[in-house]
Amino acid sequence: MHINDWPTDERPREKLLARGAAVLSDAELLAIFVGSGLRGQDAVRTARDLLHRHGPLRCLLDRPAKALARLPGLGPASACKLSAALELANRHLLSDLERGEALSDPSSVGRYFSQRLRARNYEVFAALFLDSRHRAIAFEELFTGTIDAAEIHPREVVRRALLHNAAAVVVGHNHPSGNPEPSEADRAVTQRLLQALGLVDIRLLDHFVIGDGRPVSLAERGWVP
């Protein structure tokens, strides 16, 4: 059955317009970009097959546009639209931080780190430097490779914070394995940074660990006083 033969309130586009995007399943949202679907399949079925073969959703959407364009059921036009929509969503998410507004929602900072680091297939340790009103000054990737307590140099974080005249710092790093649970090394790094930054009266506000799903905040765990 073609999707146009479905009841109107079950078609993805009509459902989105009537009830909002949040009520659509992953397959229904993807079907809007798929368009007509493969021959003999409706768009939702094609989208489900894409998620089954190339998912989960994050793995599918982290692919560059050229890789998406090669997947059956997408093609160049749909892949470009999908990549453009993702980039617009990322820019919307990051806009408050990047235009210098005060940060009042810690979860938005975690999402910022997630968008910047999640897709990397190697570990990256980054810092967000803030002024005394907790407005973003700069975001920098400081260390890459295998991140452990021996690889993170607090002096470099302090040096960059002083260079930016920062009053506070939020740090974060990704776990390419997808497991965001903080390790003992992550906790050790956090304590070393707290001590080093404290010597120059700069606050460490949080340390986020990025993996699949929601970023883990060490401050929420009580490990950043």
Swiss-Prot record:
Keyword rRNA-binding: no
Pfam families documented for this protein: RadC (PF04002), UPF0758_N (PF20582)
Motif (JAMM motif): 173-186
SUPFAM superfamilies linked: RuvA domain 2-like
Biological processes annotated in GO: proteolysis
Entry-linked CDD domains: MPN_DUF2466 (cd08071)
Residue ranges occupied by any MPN domain in the UniProt entry: 102-224
Molecular function per GO: metal ion binding; metallopeptidase activity
Keyword annotations of the record: Hydrolase, Metal-binding, Metalloprotease, Protease, Zinc
Claim: Kinase is one of the keywords in the record: no
Residues that coordinate or bind Zn(2+): H173, H175, D186
Record-stated family: Belongs to the UPF0758 family.
PANTHER family: DNA REPAIR PROTEIN RADC, UPF0758 PROTEIN YEES-RELATED
Protein name, per record: UPF0758 protein XCC3860
